[in-house]
């Protein structure tokens, strides 16, 4: 889908660049496949802010997207492509031959009327799902499982994908968009193709109000706060903060390693940080 610009009737319209969604379904989602979604304004169950600068925004219904694709060897027809406010990618409504409906992540080049299927050995075409170990080397995939049966976790955002670059016994070597290469068990499933809406990276919000519609509140820098509010705060006049950049809680930011799951380090063959060190 192409990008859409607007006549500069206002400053917000002048800057605005959006994805053309005219080809998507314009009605409401399937009610049985949606759930209510409470807005928490970045607060947790105790009422404390856990994510700053969140709140407001348009009311949204959560679409129940099938990331597991456990209905094996049953063909499904793509009924329509839809917008989903909860994610950057588009979703597709599919209808199985037995009448059951489900939402899936829509890959690129998937069209209304296409047939998709999940199984051990299926055609390598967008939307089909099979175990990574049965796919040929070089295949572009998305919605990749990390644990067998858990459902897809990797490459789910708009335009993202991973590529199978090799095999190692029961595992396959997967290269991510970030440059990271890691081992994933061959029995983990993945969907073929790249995720839809690759132009999402090129949009321009245009004005602050549109960010508010998305539930994003103004982001304040630490150097303009008081010392009680942030380690960078205070000082007479404008300052540079006076120390290496830190979070409001004093922890180093900008480059500090935060990964703590050492038990899965053995599955990462090439770190995504390796390119930065060159």
UniProtKB/Swiss-Prot annotation:
Any one GO molecular-function label of the UniProt entry: transferase activity
Matches recorded under SUPFAM superfamilies: Nucleic acid-binding proteins, Translation proteins SH3-like domain
Region (Disordered): 222-278
InterPro entries hit by this protein: NA-bd_OB-fold, Rib_uL2_dom2, Ribosomal_uL2, Ribosomal_uL2_bac/org-type, Ribosomal_uL2_C, Ribosomal_uL2_CS, Ribosomal_uL2_dom3, Ribosomal_uL2_RNA-bd_dom
Record's keyword annotation contains RNA-binding: yes
A Pfam family hit: Ribosomal_L2_C
Additional information: The initiator methionine may be removed.
Subunit structure comment from the entry: Part of the 50S ribosomal subunit. Forms a bridge to the 30S subunit in the 70S ribosome.
Reported function: One of the primary rRNA binding proteins. Required for association of the 30S and 50S subunits to form the 70S ribosome, for tRNA binding and peptide bond formation. It has been suggested to have peptidyltransferase activity; this is somewhat controversial. Makes several contacts with the 16S rRNA in the 70S ribosome.
Protein name as catalogued: Large ribosomal subunit protein uL2
């Amino acid at each position: 889908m192409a990008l859409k610009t607007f006549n500069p009737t206002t400053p917000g319209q002048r800057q605005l660049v959006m994805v053309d969604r005219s080809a998507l379904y314009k009605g409401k989602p399937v009610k049985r496949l949606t759930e209510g979604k409470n807005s928490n304004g970045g607060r947790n169950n105790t009422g404390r802010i856990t994510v700053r600068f969140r709140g407001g925004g348009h009311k949204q219904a959560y679409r129940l997207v099938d990331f597991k694709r456990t209905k094996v060897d049953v063909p499904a027809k793509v009924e329509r492509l839809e917008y989903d406010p909860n994610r950057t990618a588009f979703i597709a409504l599919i209808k199985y031959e037995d009448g059951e409906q489900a939402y899936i992540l829509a890959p690129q080049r998937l069209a209304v009327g296409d047939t998709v299927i999940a199984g051990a050995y299926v055609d390598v075409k967008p939307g089909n799902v099979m175990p990574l170990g049965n796919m040929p080397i070089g295949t572009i995939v998305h919605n990749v499982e990390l644990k067998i049966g858990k459902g897809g976790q990797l490459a789910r955002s708009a335009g993202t994908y991973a590529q199978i670059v090799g095999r190692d016994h029961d595992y396959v070597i997967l290269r991510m968009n970030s440059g990271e290469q890691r081992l994933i068990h061959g029995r983990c499933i993945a969907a073929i193709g790249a995720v839809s809406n690759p132009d999402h990276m090129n949009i321009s919000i245009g004005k602050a109000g549109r960010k508010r519609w998305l539930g994003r509140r103004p982001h304040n820098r630490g150097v303009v706060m008081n010392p009680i509010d942030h380690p960078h705060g205070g000082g007479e006049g404008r300052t540079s903060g006076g120390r290496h950049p830190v979070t409001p809680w004093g922890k180093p930011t900008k480059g500090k390693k935060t990964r703590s799951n050492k038990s899965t380090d053995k599955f990462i063959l090439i770190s995504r940080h390796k390119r930065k060190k060159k």
